[in-house]
């Protein structure tokens, strides 16, 4: 079967990861003790994608948990599903990375990385046909960003032909946890551009907005935010785990969504999202889901798809529905909003249909879009980066761990290149192919920016 090895790193990654395992254990009928308590054969049919069956019918997640301090791990271990994980798969240091990317990537993290890779290798060897890896981490801190990207590049070296998918929490526009977020995030993006196949971009502020606006929660907690993310994570891998009429997997997703190798940063959304009170006033239909899924307020990261154009997009539906209706809706969206899709990739919507809806819903849809609007995200981080880097603020924390200023300059220009690439394809049209000169295009894009 097509197994996926899940790696979570740092505080944010471990908290999202823990929530994700709660969600899919619930879907597959796995109790917190690891025993099967479900009621349908479908739950077990492809359970091996995320779980390994141990002796006595116990199901163990193919998960590797890493952190540079024991705190978050302890709370995962004592959390509701803490007994699910294999104790050897908790790999942690004692020092912490102190929000310092260099500590995570070069010093503290580098000391721990071999023991993490041993566990990853062990999990990968336990698979019949490994499909790929999914990593949850944040880019603002030290461990998830520094050590997370170190792990990604090491795994890339060892398994070059497997898909590497990450769920990366970017720094939010207004809410900042750390002053040095722009540094950490820029250095991480520099790595993700080269070593990941698909990056789902998430940020806390957009998640808070969804909780306030759509779910009408007055005081959303990180638990609520992580629940949103894990709903989307579960949707992306759903068709690997349950039978469906139109299957998709990580590789199909990558092939359909990545038109140019560097542009693999995706917006994700999930529908239906309704507040508790108004659920019974809405019918769940394919048109209704399609409408909500394309709503800018539904995106889990703070860039507005209306400010750019979709290169490609993908809708993964779950539940009993007619595939014909799904196809019609997809076509309908593209025709009505044709200006928001680039015209030089015809039919750039992929859809998948999986028969089993998530717990408590009749049908749902997960949306993954490759939009040029994501450049807003990078531009914002890049501006903050430049403001600090020009004054060399906080730089001694990084150079003290052996980093070179050159690396910062490289990461900065890589990020700016990424922004102008997105801009170039946003402006490109189907006709001008002949006279379109590469260099000229990039210059124009920078002028426009």
UniProtKB/Swiss-Prot annotation:
Entry-linked SUPFAM superfamilies: Tubulin C-terminal domain-like (SSF55307), Tubulin nucleotide-binding domain-like (SSF52490)
Origin: domain of life: Eukaryota
Stretch list, region Disordered: 426-449
GO biological process, one term: microtubule-based process
GO cellular component assignments: cytoplasm; microtubule
SMART domains, A to Z: Tubulin, Tubulin_C
PROSITE patterns: TUBULIN, TUBULIN_B_AUTOREG
GO molecular function: GTP binding; GTPase activity; metal ion binding; structural constituent of cytoskeleton
Keyword flag ATP-binding: no
Keywords: Cytoplasm, Cytoskeleton, GTP-binding, Magnesium, Metal-binding, Microtubule, Nucleotide-binding
InterPro entries: Beta-tubulin_BS, Beta_tubulin, Tub_FtsZ_C, Tubulin, Tubulin/FtsZ-like_C, Tubulin/FtsZ_2-layer-sand-dom, Tubulin/FtsZ_GTPase_sf, Tubulin_C
Bias (Acidic residues) ranges: 429-443
Cofactor: Mg(2+)
List of residues binding GTP: 11, 69, 138, 142-144, 204, 226
Binding locations of Mg(2+): 69
Location in the cell: Cytoplasm, Cytoskeleton
Family: Belongs to the tubulin family.
Role played: Tubulin is the major constituent of microtubules, a cylinder consisting of laterally associated linear protofilaments composed of alpha- and beta-tubulin heterodimers. Microtubules grow by the addition of GTP-tubulin dimers to the microtubule end, where a stabilizing cap forms. Below the cap, tubulin dimers are in GDP-bound state, owing to GTPase activity of alpha-tubulin.
Subunit-level organization: Dimer of alpha and beta chains. A typical microtubule is a hollow water-filled tube with an outer diameter of 25 nm and an inner diameter of 15 nM. Alpha-beta heterodimers associate head-to-tail to form protofilaments running lengthwise along the microtubule wall with the beta-tubulin subunit facing the microtubule plus end conferring a structural polarity. Microtubules usually have 13 protofilaments but different protofilament numbers can be found in some organisms and specialized cells.
Protein known as: Tubulin beta chain
Lineage of origin: Eukaryota, Sar, Alveolata, Apicomplexa, Conoidasida
């Amino acid at each position: 079967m097509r197994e996926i090895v899940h790696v979570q790193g740092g505080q944010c990654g471990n908290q999202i990861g823990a929530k994700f395992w709660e969600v899919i254990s619930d879907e597959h009928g796995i109790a917190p003790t690891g025993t099967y308590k479900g009621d349908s054969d479908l739950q077990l049919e492809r359970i091996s994608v995320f779980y390994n069956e141990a002796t006595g019918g116990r199901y163990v997640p193919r998960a590797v948990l890493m952190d540079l301090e024991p705190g978050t791990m302890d709370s995962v271990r004592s959390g509701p599903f803490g007994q699910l994980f294999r104790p050897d798969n908790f790999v942690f240091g004692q020092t912490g990375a102190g929000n310092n990317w260099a500590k995570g990537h070069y010093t503290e993290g580098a000391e721990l990385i071999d023991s993490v890779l041993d566990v990853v290798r062990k999990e990968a060897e336990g698979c019949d046909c490994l499909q790929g890896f999914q990593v949850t981490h944040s880019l603002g801190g030290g461990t998830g960003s520094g050590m997370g990207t170190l792990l990604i590049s090491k795994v890339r070296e060892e398994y070059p032909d497997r898909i590497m998918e990450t769920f990366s929490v970017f720094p939010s526009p207004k809410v900042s946890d750390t002053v040095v977020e722009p540094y950490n995030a820029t250095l991480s993006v520099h790595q993700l551009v080269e070593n990941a196949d698909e990056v789902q971009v998430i940020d806390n502020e957009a998640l808070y907005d969804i909780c306030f606006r759509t779910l009408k929660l007055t005081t959303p907690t990180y638990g609520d935010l992580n629940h949103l993310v894990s709903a989307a994570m579960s949707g992306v891998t759903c068709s690997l785990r349950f039978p469906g009429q139109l299957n998709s997997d990580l590789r199909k997703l990558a092939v359909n969504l990545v038109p140019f190798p560097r542009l693999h940063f995706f917006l994700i959304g999930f529908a239906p999202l309704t507040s508790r009170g108004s659920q019974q006033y809405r019918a769940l239909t394919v048109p209704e889901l399609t409408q909500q899924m394309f709503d800018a307020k539904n995106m889990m990261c703070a860039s507005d798809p209306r400010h750019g154009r979709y290169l490609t997009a993908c809708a993964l539906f779950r539940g009993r529905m007619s595939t014909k209706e799904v196809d019609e809706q997809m076509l309908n969206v593209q025709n009505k909003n044709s200006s928001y899709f680039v015209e030089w990739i015809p039919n750039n919507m992929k859809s998948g249909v999986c028969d089993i809806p998530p717990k408590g819903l009749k049908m749902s849809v997960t949306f993954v879009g490759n939009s040029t609007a994501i450049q807003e995200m990078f531009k914002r981080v890049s501006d903050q980066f430049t403001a600090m880097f020009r004054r060399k603020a906080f730089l001694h924390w990084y150079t003290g761990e052996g980093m070179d200023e050159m690396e910062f300059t490289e990461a900065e220009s890589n990020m700016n290149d990424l922004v102008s690439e997105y801009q170039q394809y946003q402006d490109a049209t189907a006709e001008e192919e002949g006279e379109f000169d590469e260099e000229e295009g990039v210059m124009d894009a920078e002028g426009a920016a």
